[in-house]
């Protein structure tokens, strides 16, 4: 199939909207009722992570492991808006063989991770895979959200899986792959069922011994990794600090190269914290160190720089714990592990201690009650927040996550930056919800590493006046660096960047589908729509690379946006690189009139599914 033929994907997924919303609601009851949770009595130091964290070790019968992971997949593969959450953790050792591989599917809200200090400490001979989902005969990866793979090696042996040869990871947003070593071919699209559309994606700190097939993935970010080869681009493939990355080529050349945006190094990075088990069977959390101007993996040449924090220094929370209980533990100097589940919060979780770690296992989800802010992080150095979903509640919250109060911005040091890794926001979809802004960053020197802020376009409680949300991300701090900023469907500016010396490497956006009229969606008199990415008028320095914004206005009336990117014309020359807009479907109306300010052509029904690009601005 042509990689440019994305037109019908939006029709198929939206026509199936009611089916999607209904089919993804599941009844209660965990997998443990059918398959006993693995445990090892010899590991007396093993913490209690709750019934939805499965810990495997190589001494277990493979049939037991297979039965457990298959039972989780059977529940989660179609469970898009369910409340069940799981973490599947593998102790150091080898699982499966070339003749009897361990192959299993990863569904919604499932985190698969090795428990070694290095990705090479856990080896799976087989595959840990994702498949297309099929609705009305259309099989795509467009809604393969909220799942992850990390900290292990896969020796890709897909014996007995037919067309599915190698490692398949056809995912969309909020489905990161981190600290993974894959030996053999990897594909980011599921070409075994059609039309195979896909819209991802994020990889970091990983090594691929074999070509990665991008296929139909319309955009993707690879950061600080090592590649043997990369097959192709579609709209916006971005590589930052990647050894073996394709050469810079934007816009793409038909039957030639790209579209690729390639940066030799990443300016400042800090990998996500992760759980591991040491040689004495003691559990710890490893906190990687900050790196500057780096390329390649942190572990390829030896141990990842950083520090280990013993599990005794963590409060291990369960969904039944109140926010008051969690805050009490944080005030007494504990770090925080959030185990799988949905947490109903009657007060804000307050992270106030420097270098505090908040680590989610299995996509824990925070839901505010009474319009509160779900979590606030003080303007202090070194806080690590990773692996958490922030859902909006029934009553409007002014924000869901606040990083820094705004009046202490200098305390977050560049040498020890606060870092948000794999942090996701959702307005509606699972349950009706409202929030004016999802994420507000007031602190300086913050790293944002894989953020998806999504005002739901399908599911429960969805509508222009139902799941209301002005803005996905507001950055007020200086020296903030973002990698993989995915922000979609908000009703005003989707991103507002007010800080100086900020950098965004990769941006993916879809404008809201559902403005009911042009009059209802106007930035100002005479300015149609709202820009997807707004850089504040007073900002004197900002850099952006590989930034795309798409439109699909589906209410049957022409809706236009004057432009997708709005920035001061006084920015230094060539501050922004490789920008694009796209009119997604011939079923849509209106479009985007310019790419950035008044520069760049229009994306309308006259040029559907065709990138309109600006290589450099101003």
Positions of PLM-derived features:
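Gly/Ser/Thr/Ala-enriched C-terminal appendages of enzymes
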Residues: 216, 233-285, 393-394, 507, ...
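Right-handed parallel beta-helix
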Residues: 87, 95-246, 350, 389-488, ...
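Secretory targeting and sorting signals
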Residues: 2-36
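Right-handed parallel beta-helix/beta-solenoid
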Residues: 36-67, 290-323
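N-terminal extracellular ligand-recognition/capping segment immediately after the signal peptide
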Residues: 54, 58-111, 117-122, 127-129, ...
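Long amphipathic alpha-helical scaffold regions
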Residues: 347, 352-380, 384, 501-543
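Beta-propeller domains
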Residues: 320-335, 457, 465-503
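Generic beta-strand/beta-sheet core signal
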Residues: 91, 339, 361, 483-485, ...
């Amino acid at each position: 199939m042509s990689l440019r033929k994305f037109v019908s994907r939006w029709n198929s997924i939206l026509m199936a909207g009611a089916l999607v919303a209904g089919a993804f609601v599941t009844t209660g009851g965990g997998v443990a009722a059918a398959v006993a949770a693995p445990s090892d009595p010899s590991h007396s130091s093993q913490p209690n992570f709750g019934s939805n964290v499965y810990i495997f070790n190589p001494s277990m019968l493979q049939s037991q492991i297979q039965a457990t992971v298959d039972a989780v997949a059977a529940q989660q593969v179609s469970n898009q808006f369910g409340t069940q959450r799981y973490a599947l953790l593998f102790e150091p050792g080898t699982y499966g063989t070339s003749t009897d591989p361990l192959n299993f599917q990863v569904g919604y809200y499932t985190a698969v991770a090795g428990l070694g200090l290095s990705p090479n400490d856990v080896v799976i001979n087989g595959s840990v895979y994702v498949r297309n989902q099929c609705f009305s005969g259309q099989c795509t990866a467009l809604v393969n959200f909220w799942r992850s793979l990390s900290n292990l090696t896969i020796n890709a042996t897909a014996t007995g899986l037919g067309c599915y040869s190698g490692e398949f990871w056809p995912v969309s947003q909020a489905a990161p792959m981190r600290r993974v070593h894959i030996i053999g071919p990897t594909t980011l699209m599921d070409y075994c069922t059609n039309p195979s559309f896909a819209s991802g994606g994020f990889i970091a700190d990983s090594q691929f011994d074999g070509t990665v097939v991008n296929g139909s993935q319309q955009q993707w970010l690879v950061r600080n990794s090592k590649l043997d080869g990369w097959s192709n681009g579609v709209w916006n493939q971005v590589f930052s600090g990647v050894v073996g990355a394709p050469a810079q080529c934007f816009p793409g050349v038909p039957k030639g190269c790209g579209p690729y945006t390639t940066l030799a190094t990443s300016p400042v990075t800090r990998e996500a914290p992760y759980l591991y088990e040491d040689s004495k069977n003691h559990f710890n959390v490893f906190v990687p160190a900050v790196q500057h101007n780096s390329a390649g993996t942190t572990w390829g040449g030896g141990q990842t720089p950083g520090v280990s924090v013993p599990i005794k220094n963590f409060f291990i929370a369960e969904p039944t714990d109140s926010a008051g209980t969690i805050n009490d533990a944080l005030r007494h100097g504990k770090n925080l592990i959030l185990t799988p589940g949905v947490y109903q919060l009657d007060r804000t979780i307050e992270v106030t201690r420097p270098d505090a770690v908040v680590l989610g296992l299995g996509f824990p989800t925070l839901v505010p009650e009474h319009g509160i802010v779900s979590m606030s992080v003080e303007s202090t150095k070194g806080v690590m927040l990773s692996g958490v979903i922030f859902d909006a509640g029934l009553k409007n919250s002014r924000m869901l996550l606040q990083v820094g109060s705004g009046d202490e911005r200098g305390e977050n040091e560049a040498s020890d930056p606060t870092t948000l890794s794999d942090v996701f926001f959702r307005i509606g979809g699972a349950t009706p919800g409202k929030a004016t802004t999802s994420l507000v960053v007031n602190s300086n020197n913050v790293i944002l590493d894989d953020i998806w802020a999504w005002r739901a376009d399908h599911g429960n409680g969805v509508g222009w006046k139902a799941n209301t949300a002005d803005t996905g991300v507001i950055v007020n701090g200086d020296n903030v660096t973002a990698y993989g900023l995915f922000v979609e469907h908000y009703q005003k500016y989707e991103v507002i960047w007010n800080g100086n010396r900020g950098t965004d490497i990769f941006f993916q956006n879809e404008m809201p589908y559902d403005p009911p009229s042009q009059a209802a969606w106007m930035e100002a008199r005479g300015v149609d729509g709202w820009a997807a990415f707004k850089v504040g008028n007073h900002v004197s320095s900002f850099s952006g690379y590989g930034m795309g914004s798409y439109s699909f206005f589906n209410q049957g009336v022409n809706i236009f946006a004057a432009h997708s990117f709005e920035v001061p014309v006084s920015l230094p020359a060539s501050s922004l690189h490789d920008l694009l807009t796209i009119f997604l479907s011939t079923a849509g109306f209106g479009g985007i009139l310019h790419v950035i300010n008044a520069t760049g052509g229009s994306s309308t029904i006259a040029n559907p599914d065709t990138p309109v690009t600006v290589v450099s601005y101003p």
